[in-house]
Amino acid sequence: MDLEAKVKKMGLGHEQGFGAPCLKCKEKCEGFELHFWRKICRNCKCGQEEHDVLLSNEEDRKVGKLFEDTKYTTLIAKLKSDGIPMYKRNVMILTNPVAAKKNVSINTVTYEWAPPVQNQALARQYMQMLPKEKQPVAGSEGAQYRKKQLAKQLPAHDQDPSKCHELSPKEVKEMEQFVKKYKSEALGVGDVKLPRDMNTQGPNRMYIPGGDRSTTTAVGAMEDKSAEHKRTQYSCYCCKLSMKEGDPAIYAERAGYDKLWHPACFVCSACHELLVDMIYFWKNGKLYCGRHYCDSEKPRCAGCDELIFSNEYTQAENQNWHLKHFCCFDCDNILAGEIYVMVNDKPVCKPCYVKNHAVVCQGCHNAIDPEVQRVSYNNFSWHASTECFLCSCCSRCLIGQKFMPVEGMVFCSVECKKMMS
């Protein structure tokens, strides 16, 4: 795909989810409207994952593209219409008879994702070992959690140049090489197994999720398996607690066949969130989600949230920025050489700070300039001047003096306080 086509495709992405309500801001947000280059809503400044955007097909395309040209192609299918790879996520539907007084009804539970194993009982056990609020039951808090983690852990702009803002041809090429490298060296998908089954696993046997699930024994493993199992004690690589014989465990091929995790312990070592759909990246003995693996390899722009492939970028406030994206969070004016104030880890220009964020002086009731000295006590502030920081009774200047605060007032003495009470 040429660069012009990629830019056109990027523009179409701004139409997705338009007008969707914000789950965090509720009625305060007029509806989702994607900022031109930030990955946030222009109206409320929350991310797309905080909005009720229906993106199941888009997410399946994103994960499908991630698995393209990897050993995990068994987990994708290509659409006949345009050849786009789609993620074949495993959906599990459980039916439980519910006895009533006169008849028996059927209670159906649908999991929007489940481990791709043939043994449904094993998949069900896996789900039960996850925190209830993280079980991806359709229409539940857990399904919303999975949706949010798909967006957070596997950003489309970490693998697809067409989802990025104005990359140069050189940057596009570097990004494509970077993606190819992490697909071949770090990307993996966990597999759910019983610890006793790990005795058939070894360096000469490889498992591909969604592929052949035969129980072929590893080369050289000819001794009695029951005797071998009695000698083997498995513990979780994360929490170090022992594995129970009948409980499912997660195996990550890139980590080695000797390492297992409890389902609830298969988390990113940086954000400590469950690895969504058991998709992991392995580096230096640690599990990472896609986002934090990429962060360990490349600087990420704090403005657009994209990885930086340019040799020239700026660093400020312990964060990295594309030169063109070091801008005011409120008005988008470039801040190079300008005075700015950090508000919730976001840079804001001086005019926007005074207009939208500055504290108000209790004395003169005007906004306090960020470069001006002030006196603060609890949630109240004053200009540190002889005109503003005064006794609320006798107007004596209190700079450098002891004072008695009472809500938004200050007094120089008990007598003045009594006179105002």
From Swiss-Prot:
Classification via InterPro entries: LIM1_Testin, LIM2_Testin, LIM3_Testin, PET_domain, PET_testin, Pk/Esn/Tes, Znf_LIM
CDD domains in the cross-refs: LIM1_Testin, LIM2_Testin, LIM3_Testin, PET_testin
Molecular functions per Gene Ontology: zinc ion binding
Comp. bias intervals (Basic and acidic residues): 155-164
Stretch list, region Disordered: 133-164, 193-213
Subcellular location per the Swiss-Prot or TrEMBL entry: Cytoplasm; Cell junction, Focal adhesion
Superkingdom of the organism of origin: Eukaryota
GO biological process: negative regulation of cell population proliferation
Domain LIM zinc-binding, chain residue ranges per copy: 234-297, 299-359, 362-421
Transmembrane segments: none
GO cellular component, one term: focal adhesion
SMART domains: LIM
Positions of the PET domain: 92-199
Function as written in the Swiss-Prot or TrEMBL entry: Scaffold protein that may play a role in cell adhesion, cell spreading and in the reorganization of the actin cytoskeleton. Plays a role in the regulation of cell proliferation. May act as a tumor suppressor.
Family affiliation: Belongs to the prickle / espinas / testin family.
Subunit and partners: Interacts via LIM domain 1 with ZYX. Interacts (via LIM domain 3) with ENAH and VASP. Interacts with ALKBH4, talin, actin, alpha-actinin, GRIP1 and PXN. Interacts (via LIM domain 2) with ACTL7A (via N-terminus). Heterodimer with ACTL7A; the heterodimer interacts with ENAH to form a heterotrimer.
Free-text comment about domains: The N-terminal and the C-terminal halves of the protein can associate with each other, thereby hindering interactions with ZYX.
Name of this chain's protein: Testin
Originating organism: Muntiacus reevesi (Reeves' muntjac)
Record lineage: Eukaryota, Metazoa, Chordata, Craniata, Vertebrata
Gene: TES
